[in-house]
Amino acid sequence: MKAGFLNGKLSTKQVILDAKNIFHNARWFNGIVVCPYCGEVHKIYQAKDGSYSYKCGKCNTKFNDKTKTLLHGSKLSIESWMQGIYEVFTDNFITSTQLAIKLHINQKYAWLMLAKLRFGLLQDDYLLSGIIAQDEMYIGGSLSNFHYERKLRLLRENHYILPNERKYDKSAIFALNSKLKQPVFGLNDGNKIVLYATPNPIKSSYIKKVVKKHITEGISVADESKLYNDWKQETGLELSTNNHHNNQYQSKDGYTSNPIENTFSWYKRGFIGVTHCKYHQLYLNEFVFRYNTRDMNHSDRFREALKHTIGKTITYKDIKQQKSIFKTTKRNELSLEEIKSMLETGIVSEVIQNHQKYTKESFK
């Protein structure tokens, strides 16, 4: 294989014509084939036809370059995969329908390819340090833009109004808005970012767990949220606070959380299309990878993306069965009489404060 494919610039034509060699060199370090099942190095026999198919002399297992990678078990050719990876990471955000047209494949195959690639871009290896800005954002449409009948249905399902009631208070809309959206917690140290879709409602314990995983040392910069109470005791990091309610956007030490807020703004503007909250972490993985490799050219980013396909396997069943972190915790039962009395005494506000106690069974 020519050195240009390893270090130089690549074009779509080059990627397609030499796809097998490109993936082979990315798959095996220094060209040394290792059995993915038992780790044998010496007794590896290649197929006589010269293809990239092998047999291990130790465990008698047959394998190829796609074994134990994101391409494992895929019916698509290596050429289609290499072109797909190149198209995804050398262009702006691309949808499965656009990718299907470029690769001349079914949209379902293109969707699965995108899902696998995004799954492979895990954020576990990113370590941040220095001055780290952190904040939360909420992704999703505003309830005020929903059709009137849909608003009523959602308000009834979440027990902000009684069954068959057709009037609602604006405070109920405001409270339900945050509940229907997907929370995202982010970190930005000025060089790299980390974004995680969190359970709704967002919890302080989850945030501190993410911070301990990704921040080695430094100073955290955040707003006045209660999520950051007992910060230094539980994370070991200094916390600099900006009180946004008092129009304070820079702390006394001169630190600001604007970098992560800018990141959220880029994400909301850049990710346009049909998305589902169940797979939102996959979209965040792609955005984080693009941001953290923004200084690379297209060819280097393509090679970096190839590294994330190695040693990871996932099937369509795994993707569809993954649990949605968007789901809220189950609420305790409350009788219809109790809800009526609460509405009579506290109108809507008290119901909003206690909405986590209600379940749909209360109205049956």
Where are each of the predicted segments found?
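Residue-level recognition of single "structural anchor" positions
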Residues: M1-K364
